[in-house]
Curated annotation (Swiss-Prot):
Part of the 50S ribosomal subunit. Forms a bridge to the 30S subunit in the 70S ribosome. InterPro entries: NA-bd_OB-fold (IPR012340), Rib_uL2_dom2 (IPR014722), Ribosomal_uL2 (IPR002171), Ribosomal_uL2_bac/org-type (IPR005880), Ribosomal_uL2_C (IPR022669), Ribosomal_uL2_CS (IPR022671), Ribosomal_uL2_dom3 (IPR014726), Ribosomal_uL2_RNA-bd_dom (IPR022666). Residues 223-257 are annotated as: Disordered. The gene is rplB. HAMAP family: Ribosomal_uL2_B. GO terms for biological process: cytoplasmic translation. NCBIfam families: rplB_bact. It comes from Geobacter sulfurreducens (strain ATCC 51573 / DSM 12127 / PCA). One of its GO terms (molecular function) is structural constituent of ribosome. Pfam families: Ribosomal_L2, Ribosomal_L2_C. One of the primary rRNA binding proteins. Required for association of the 30S and 50S subunits to form the 70S ribosome, for tRNA binding and peptide bond formation. It has been suggested to have peptidyltransferase activity; this is somewhat controversial. Makes several contacts with the 16S rRNA in the 70S ribosome. One of its GO terms (cellular component) is cytosolic large ribosomal subunit. Keywords: Ribonucleoprotein, Ribosomal protein, RNA-binding, rRNA-binding. This is Large ribosomal subunit protein uL2.
Amino acid sequence: MAIKTYKPTSAGRRHQTCSAFDEITTSTPEKSLIVTIKKTGGRNSFGRITARHIGGGHKKKYRIIDFRRNKVEVPAKVASIEYDPNRSARIALLHYADGAKRYILAPLDLKVGDSIVASSNADIKPGNALPLRAIPLGTIIHNIELKIGKGGQLARSAGTFAQLMAKEGKYAQVKLPSGEVRMVLLDCMATIGQVGNIDHENVSIGKAGRSRWLGRRPKVRGVAMNPVDHPHGGGEGRTSGGRHPVTPWGIPTKGYKTRKNKTSTRFIVKKRSK
């Protein structure tokens, strides 16, 4: 994937970059695999904001992605590589030998016409899905399950990957993109390769309006608010907030650890480094 730059015809264009979309082969999604999604504006069923800075954005149709890869032993051909407005990665449309059609996350180097399969004895090549027990140590993987049959939950963003480090008992040790090493059951599925669109991290939004197209609303600083809205608010003239940085709810931020101990903590072999 290449990054497209623009001539500085305006202040917003000057530093703006975007994907060249070279790998996209069609602009029309598969109709049977799209559904309408309703916008929430970050509100819950009571109408209260539960996720800040969400709202607006271009209208989108949701593409149903096969994260489970549970169509085993049935070979499929890659029919197209498509843009998905709901995620940073590209998606690949698969045509299975039995006539079924499904979308998967498009790994790096997957091309139209390639044949892939989900099987415990599949080849170790990008796009093939196998249980962790059948994958050799050191292999680059993505779309990793945490619970058997639930579908991939780890390493799904553009350019991300994990690495299989060890196998011990009924668990595999997987190094995640954050640097964390975690134990995952050997019967959990994972897909071979790195997620495509690896230059996504180099894209510069360029202007505020483009963030609004993506459904992201402005983030207002606490010190710019009134005391009723934020612990840092108020004061005569510009102030520093007058205390150590906190969230709008008074919880210390900027380095303060907020993760609670939970059942899954025992599966973490090494804490994240990022």
